Each structure stands twice: as C-alpha cells, then as structure tokens.
C-alpha cells in the first residue's frame, strides 16, 4: 500500500477550489537534476507548497512516500488549461542519483497513479484517445504547452514507454486486472471518499464553435441530434443531470477521431 504524506498539503485558502472532471491523470517528472539526493521529494514538495500560486501538482513520488501538495479531486496548476480542469490527480516523479531510490520512487509513482485511477474511474491506458493516463508530453502535443516529461528521465533510469504502459495497466511486475490496485484498501489511504458524481463516467461535450453536443464515457462518443434527447441528459425531462465539458470542435475531433464525432453517428441510431 502506498504511503501518502500530508506534511506539505495546501491548507485553507491555498490552491484551487474548483473540482476537476474525471478524465485524465497527468504524470510528470520534476526535471530537476540539481535535486537528486535522498530528500529530493520533500524538497520539491516544500517548494511547491510555498510557491503554489505559480505551479503545483497533487503529489510528488519519492523513494519512501508519496507527498501530497494539492487535494486530489480538485484542479491543480500542473499542466495548463484545459488539462488541469480535466485532471483530478497529477503527480511528479522525483529525480534520484541512487539507482535503488530511482526504482523505489518509480514503484510509488505507478502505485499512486493506479490507486487514484481507481478512485476517479479513469482508464489505465497511456497517451491514447479519450480518458486515461496522460504524460505531460501528450498534453503538450495535443492540448497546450511544450513540456516533454517524463519520458527522458524514465529512459535514463531504464523505463521505456512500453514498460511504463504495461506497469500502469498491470502493476509493477504483475498481470492484475485493469484498474485494480495491489491492495483494495489503498484507495482510502489519503482519507478521500468520492461522491456519486465523481464516480459517474458519462458526461456531455459541447463544441462551442459548431454548437454540436455529444455524449461520451471518455472512450466512445456519439453525437446528440435532437433537443429532446439532449434535454434528457440535461435533466429538462427529469431523467439525468450529466456534467458538461466545453471544447472546440477540432479538440473533440483530435481526441476521439473525426469518424467517431461525425454527426451521422447520432445517439438515436444505437
């Protein structure tokens, strides 16, 4: 079970009070080769805590513990908009010069991501379309920014992209079922209980330039053709009340594919 340390957790009046939608977990590395000693993670967490107005993530994986800075479930300032608003958990991997600590911190990194993916109902797929685990590089390539982490540091410590994807999907050295952590109690380790809304995978997307509405579970997406059907999902007809994510049409097409977002694939056609 991952040990979460709240020493550097932001307090009242600190950090964002905005809830994040449950679409991504963004993974980073600290990119700080000037901080590779035994206290690397605590140094990074302390700095983020004291400078949160500039940038912070929810957690920093160290060799001994995972140090929390931002409250999971809320927006953190780690990857820019719109990734921040879509990510209830973002985590940094600390740098170490000691190979044993490199390995230990990586194990904590993977375990924390898998545990939080289970809490927030996020698929354990890496850098793919729709919901899932996203590297900061994926965010830069597809949404905003120029950061390329964490692949360079991972390569340096002997972790390929394929290995990262396997470890996220199956756990370190394992072949467990997707979205299962090594210990069923581990998702409660930070004393966080998701509410019913946070367990809900289905949500609406509004393409603000084309005025199109879609419904998606983060993997499959369908166009909503009629106002009556849309009203069901918006609770106008006392049926559902789904959360809404607003995007440009090009963003929707890039994330799900133009074939998937074609209006000919409207939800009424099954």
Swiss-Prot record:
Biological process terms from the Gene Ontology for this record are:
cell wall organization; defense response to bacterium; peptidoglycan catabolic process; symbiont-mediated cytolysis of host cell
Organism of derivation: Lactococcus phage r1t
Q: Where in the cell is it found?
A: Secreted
Provide the catalytic activity annotation: Hydrolyzes the link between N-acetylmuramoyl residues and L-amino acid residues in certain cell-wall glycopeptides
Which stretches make up the N-acetylmuramoyl-L-alanine amidase domain?
22-151
- Give the record's GO CC terms: extracellular region
- Keywords carried by this UniProt record: Antimicrobial, Bacteriolytic enzyme, Cell wall biogenesis/degradation, Hydrolase, Secreted
**SMART domains named in the record:** Ami_2
- Could you say which enzyme class this protein belongs to? hydrolase
Q: From which residue to which does any coiled coil extend?
A: none
EC number(s)? 3.5.1.28
Determine if Cell wall biogenesis/degradation is one of this entry's keywords: yes
One Pfam family matching this protein: Amidase_2
Mention one GO molecular function.
N-acetylmuramoyl-L-alanine amidase activity
Family listed? Belongs to the N-acetylmuramoyl-L-alanine amidase 2 family.
Stated name of the protein: N-acetylmuramoyl-L-alanine amidase
> Entry's Gene3D superfamilies?
Peptidoglycan recognition protein-like (3.40.80.10)
